[in-house]
Amino acid sequence: MKITCNAGGLTLKNPTILAAGVLGTTGASLKRIASMGAGAVVTKSIGTEPKPGHHNPSMIRLEEGYINAMGLPNPSFGEFRQELEIARESGVPVIASIFGATPEEFTAVANGLPGADAYELNVSCPHAKGYGMQCGTDPELVRSITKAVKAAVKVPVWVKLTPNVTDIRPIGLAAQEGGADAVVAINTLKAMAIDINTGWPILGNRSGGLSGPAVKPVAIKCVYDLYEVLDIPVIGVGGVSNWADAIEFMMAGACAVEIGSAVYEDIGTFASVSMGISNYLDRKNMKLDEIIGLAHRVVKQ
């Protein structure tokens, strides 16, 4: 079964996308992920100035995922521009993940990374003071950031949302009102781990963001809620490890899925997920569009 799809203004050969922050620091690594079957790739989040990130340990493994507190380390858009050009040789859409503290900073980064096939606005990182989630919990700021970037670029703009709110729907609606072509749900959940032998928080930043299979039920619910109120596409992310996870996200309303933590276990995840989706559709004699939002239609019958 053909599984080409349209995701937020981009045509993808399959509905799997590399999530921001995983093997997205160099053009070469992004090309490698594309060669392993990803339908599109998202870069590491890039800002206006070089940022070293938080002290180690910055990532720990749990039974059902990871907690990371990288702190948005990046070389700045000026230094990353060459990596983006290399990544564009991959043959798949390359989405630049960008962050800032104000609409003006977001716009400066977008203008400083010309050539991206789309921009993903990181208004959701939970462990970078002054950035990410501190912007993304304010609907008015999300709206103004989205509007500013949309006015500055001629390619699709996606907004990556935080789950660390009481209700994600007003944030999604604010992104839509600002002109977003899609929302991406979700970024990591605020989390922490403590060494019981010393009493010290394990991460250098003390707290971080939880990703992997542990967050999937939360992500599914967020996608489901957003699909009910938005007119723009929803891209699902959070705990996708296999084709069945991807199908579940699509039934909740996602038009495509981003994959992050699972790549640490198997770089071939994109190909296996795509093949699994195709085989599932063949068995069910269905088209990809028919499973998107299916859970909503079933409950209304």
Swiss-Prot record:
User: Which EC class is this protein assigned?
Assistant: oxidoreductase
Which residues of this protein are catalytic? C125 (nucleophile)
Pfam families assigned to the protein according to its UniProt record, in alphabetical order: DHO_dh
GO biological process: one example:
'de novo' UMP biosynthetic process
* The enzyme's E.C. designation: 1.3.1.14
Residues annotated as binding substrate are K44, N68, A69, M70, G71, L72, N122, N187, T188
Q: Which InterPro entries match?
A: Aldolase_TIM, DHO_dehydrogenase, DHOD_1B, Dihydroorotate_DH_1, Dihydroorotate_DH_1_2, Dihydroorotate_DH_cat, Dihydroorotate_DH_CS, Dihydroorotate_DH_I
Its pathway, per UniProt, is: Pyrimidine metabolism; UMP biosynthesis via de novo pathway; orotate from (S)-dihydroorotate (NAD(+) route): step 1/1
Any one GO molecular-function label of the UniProt entry? dihydroorotate dehydrogenase (NAD+) activity
What reaction does this enzyme carry out catalytically?
Answer: (S)-dihydroorotate + NAD(+) = orotate + NADH + H(+)
> Record's family?
Belongs to the dihydroorotate dehydrogenase family. Type 1 subfamily.
This chain's function reads: Catalyzes the conversion of dihydroorotate to orotate with NAD(+) as electron acceptor.
Subunit info here reads:
Heterotetramer of 2 PyrK and 2 PyrD type B subunits.
Spell out the protein name for this chain: Dihydroorotate dehydrogenase B (NAD(+)), catalytic subunit
Provide the gene name from the record.
Answer: pyrD
